[in-house]
A protein has these predicted regions:
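Non-catalytic scaffold segments within catalytic domains of secreted glycoside hydrolases
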Residues: 1-164
Length: 164
């Protein structure tokens, strides 16, 4: 067994390619990019390259339709500005011929105890959602709604969008 799969299971996937049914989901957060220090330790670098060049490299390698599957921001980064920046990256990818099939802000509502990966029940709330836990829409939720309203009629008519 390698990675919980038998050799026969590996061979099945090699003999039955499913690439035509795949979408590559790329998450991107402000904390994704990391610098390796001289002593080998890691530190968050913030955004150096950004979603566009990283995702474009993945698309060039794998030639699969792409979905921006997760993004949000915490710790001093303006969520509305971040949303608009990520949307601009997605739109540029589409303009450059990358088949982009979706965009998601994660999560719909604030997250509880994600700072401990749900291992502890502390009731710690990370205010990352489009809405708070009482379903009050945050400014980033209003901005997301505005993006949808502005683009919903245009996106299906663009010649380089949603083509798989």
């Amino acid at each position: 067994m390698d990675n919980c799969m038998s050799r026969a299971e590996y061979h099945w996937f090699f003999e039955h390619p499913v690439k035509s049914h795949c979408v590559m989901g790329n998450d991107y957060y402000f904390t994704n990019e990391t610098m390796v220090c001289r002593n080998g330790s890691l530190t968050s670098s913030g955004e150096i390259f950004g979603y566009y060049p990283i995702t474009h490299q993945y698309f060039s390698r794998y030639r699969l339709p792409v979905m921006h599957t997760e993004t949000n921001c915490l710790g001093g980064v303006d969520p509305v500005g971040w949303l608009r920046k990520e949307w601009a990256n997605v739109h540029r990818l589409k303009q450059d011929g990358v088949p982009l099939v979706g965009f998601t802000w994660y999560s719909l509502q604030d997250q509880v105890d994600w700072n401990t990966a749900l291992r502890e029940n502390n009731g710690h709330v990370d205010e990352l959602g489009l809405c708070d836990l009482n379903r009050n829409i945050r400014p980033v939720g209003h901005a997301y709604k505005q993006l949808i309203q502005r683009w919903r009629d245009l996106l299906p008519t663009e010649s380089n969008v949603l083509r798989i």
